[in-house]
């Protein structure tokens, strides 16, 4: 497998990444796939054996179901060198603050993602899309706070 430097992060990631939008099959995501735990475990083993070292997911995929399946499949023990990337932005509830890139939403969703993934570390936490309602400074400060808190 070929690996490349991820910006200035110090991380080297495989040129292929395992996308997980098809995990869980809940809500609108049922249209693109409905992989369940046994299949997810097999896929993680296959990509890890091929040298893929980055699993990409998002809190919104199957309403958190994708992250839950990854957490169940890997348990509290990740494969050596496997990195996890997840994202936040889209609605995760009906409340007015259950969406967007506000500090409140990002920190709350990061904590929820950690629980669903059954891990204490997210290697790459990303914004899923621009949020024109939240000042960029607030978003960047929230992300910086998450990095500093570990």
List PLM regions with ranges.
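A short linear-motif detector with a strong N-terminal bias
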Residues: 61-65, 86, 104-106
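N-terminal binding-site loop/beta-alpha segment at the start of enzyme catalytic domains
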Residues: 1-82, 148
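Hydrophobic positions in alpha-helices of CheY-like receiver
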Residues: 74, 88, 143-146
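Active-site beta-loop-alpha junctions enriched in small/polar residues
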Residues: 21, 58-60, 87-91, 127-130
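Acidic active-site catalytic centers that drive phospho-/nucleotidyl reactions
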Residues: 56, 67, 87, 120-123
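Glycine/proline-rich, positively charged
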Residues: 27, 32, 93-150
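Structural motif corresponding to the early beta-alpha repeats
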Residues: 77-101
